[in-house]
């Protein structure tokens, strides 16, 4: 370059001026605009490398469902919906920098599709999402909507969700931006009904409003120190590519669906419609629409951020029985492993398993009720077991009493003492009547 010429950017040729400062190097200069462009190019290279690392982990929806089948029993429709949604989401991210396909002739920007899951407590909502995140190998964060508050209230603000996701990613912003966030108990953010009038929960609606931009896609500034002050260094997390999944029990939602699809019978006498058998909750929720969620109390803008809606079915006795024994980490397998660590073999009879499933149905807490019943039945045995080195086996069985009652009892087998007999364990039994009274 001629020394008589004005200094200019070696990349774009922009001349140095009060508004265009230049950074000088050994053999040239660069302006601020070209620095930003270079940063975008280098960042794109890094993103492509991350895409290549994630690409081998992207499997087909069929493969995702097979993995979910190993951990979650039943819920076929929900598992298929989640598998397709997750596959499409990460397929979109892997091809975001790809050249336009020849059939379209232009680049089409794909919008992300967040997911809302409705279903009774204990049906596997959290387990499904956590399992998918583990299969994908992406950061995962879970937030309880009941702890979130809008600005000006005491509690966790919505930005704390991204802070947890960033922590799960080890502080790597790029990795966090490909993560999954699960917001549980979103039904608690809905309006509350009192008497004949619907009273809107101001705090809950405020949280819904605060979540809108984050769920849709925005830049969230997170302090590296975790504390908010003027001097703390910040990290910027773009939420456009974060998959948000919301879940909740939505008690009473089935009644809203029923009132929509089954109008009241106002006929009299011969004009009255014949009474039909009331549909089950699962049949009603198969007809769930966004309008029903709005009627429940979620604002339309919040519902619109979750275009994919799926329902998890209420668990019946047969499904609870399978949950006890079939999954990879089935509850019975866990307790057998726990006993095996202490050199004791645990056997649970079929009659006991059926009784445990019955009691879980009475508690109305889904799969969580199974652990509660089994823990109560084995608690005293587990208390005494470390102090009984001669103990070699335990059998949990259902005992029928003369008065018609039933209870779970543990029979223990000691080390060889010449008789090899099985004797009752001095453990309190779990009686059917006590479980019923507790539920009432």
From Swiss-Prot:
Domain ClpX-type ZB spans what residues? 1-50
Note the SUPFAM superfamilies from the entry.
Glucocorticoid receptor-like (DNA-binding domain), P-loop containing nucleoside triphosphate hydrolases
Superkingdom, according to UniProt?
Answer: Bacteria
Q: Where does ATP bind?
A: 120-127
Q: Which family does it belong to?
A: Belongs to the ClpX chaperone family.
Quaternary structure and interacting proteins, as annotated: Component of the ClpX-ClpP complex. Forms a hexameric ring that, in the presence of ATP, binds to fourteen ClpP subunits assembled into a disk-like structure with a central cavity, resembling the structure of eukaryotic proteasomes.
Protein name per the record: ATP-dependent Clp protease ATP-binding subunit ClpX
Q: Which organism is it from?
A: Azotobacter vinelandii
**Name of encoding gene:** clpX
